[in-house]
Structure formats: C-alpha cells, structure tokens
C-alpha cells in the first residue's frame, strides 16, 4: 500500500487530530454526531478500535502499511515493551525529529527538506526520511535562502517549551539551525495521543 497523498482534512475528520500530518484542527465526526445519532450508533467492535489506532499511527507518521508492519516486527524482536519500542522507532526517524524540533510544521514538509538534500546529520547529507537518529547525533538544517526565511519564522513562532526534553535546538548560527539528540525519547514525550497496545494487538497475527 502506497503512502497517502490525498486530502488531509478528510483523514483527521475520520481519525481525529494528527499533529504530524497537519497542524489544522477539526472536530471529528464522532463529536459532531447529535445525541439522537449517538444513541442509535452500533457498538464498535474491538477490531475497529484496533484498526483505528493503527491508522492513526500510520497517517500521523506518514508511513505505508508495509513500513509500519516492518517497524512492528523490529519492535517485537527487541527487549522491552513492544508498544513503547515501536513509538521510539517512529519518533527517532529523521523526518519526525525535524518536526518535533519545530523547524517545520508537519512531517510531510520535513520529508521534503530531507529529499531535497538540505539536511545534514553529523556533517553528512542524509536524504532518507526514515533515517534512524541516535543519541549524540547533530542535525544541521542547511536550507538555501528560499527556505531560510520560512524556517526562521517557523522557529520564532514555535514555543521552546514544545520541544521535548530529548531534543535541543541551537540558533547560534541563524542561517544553519542545529538540532541535538540528547537521548532516546521516553513515553511521556510522545506527541501523538494513542494507545500503542491496540496497534500491537492489531498486528499480533501478522507480525
């Protein structure tokens, strides 16, 4: 299954707000339903609940079905909580790190910067959005002038307290902002509100 490239509002109306996909906020269809409509709604099956959690995770991080399944398989082979390790793997992707640093408004826009070879990790160009960042990595945003003003305005409008503790943003060189990965992200710093156990349960027979 390919990566979704359709209307983003359509997705967040169905799956609720996904900060990585779009910074627009809408009221979900579930919340828009009237009291009489809610009373006649059918009971949602456990499968549908797990499916929705999986879809929220997939669309928020901009993954294909195969990519997410591969991450689940990797998480299963690692020591520790499969759900938490899965979230760590997704959060430590380069495209998501740029998003969490506040350099770009969404993960798709971070992916564009990476694909255009404007991002360096430890002084080496990285053009793979799924690149796995590690503690002590230094990420440099070497965007051309056409992007610099946009990135600067974005950073200025982004509250510093929104940057999670495992990351640090340095503006000592305004034209080349740098991000530092301090340590692996913990569960409390995950930006997406989700029950990761539902995703693990969804893939229990596939991974």
From Swiss-Prot:
Residues 92-153 form the S4 RNA-binding domain. Disulfide bonds: none annotated. The keyword rRNA-binding applies. The keyword Chloroplast applies. GO terms for cellular component: chloroplast; small ribosomal subunit. CDD domains: S4 (cd00165). Its main location: plastid. SMART domains: Ribosomal_S4 (SM01390), S4 (SM00363). Keywords: Chloroplast, Plastid, Ribonucleoprotein, Ribosomal protein, RNA-binding, rRNA-binding. Pfam families: Ribosomal_S4, S4. InterPro entries: Ribosomal_uS4, Ribosomal_uS4_bac-type, Ribosomal_uS4_CS, Ribosomal_uS4_N, S4_RNA-bd, S4_RNA-bd_sf. It is found in: Plastid, Chloroplast. One of its GO terms (biological process) is translation. It comes from the Eukaryota. One of its GO terms (molecular function) is rRNA binding. Part of the 30S ribosomal subunit. Contacts protein S5. The interaction surface between S4 and S5 is involved in control of translational fidelity. Belongs to the universal ribosomal protein uS4 family. One of the primary rRNA binding proteins, it binds directly to 16S rRNA where it nucleates assembly of the body of the 30S subunit. PANTHER family: 30S 40S RIBOSOMAL PROTEIN, SMALL RIBOSOMAL SUBUNIT PROTEIN US4M. This is Small ribosomal subunit protein uS4c. The gene is rps4.
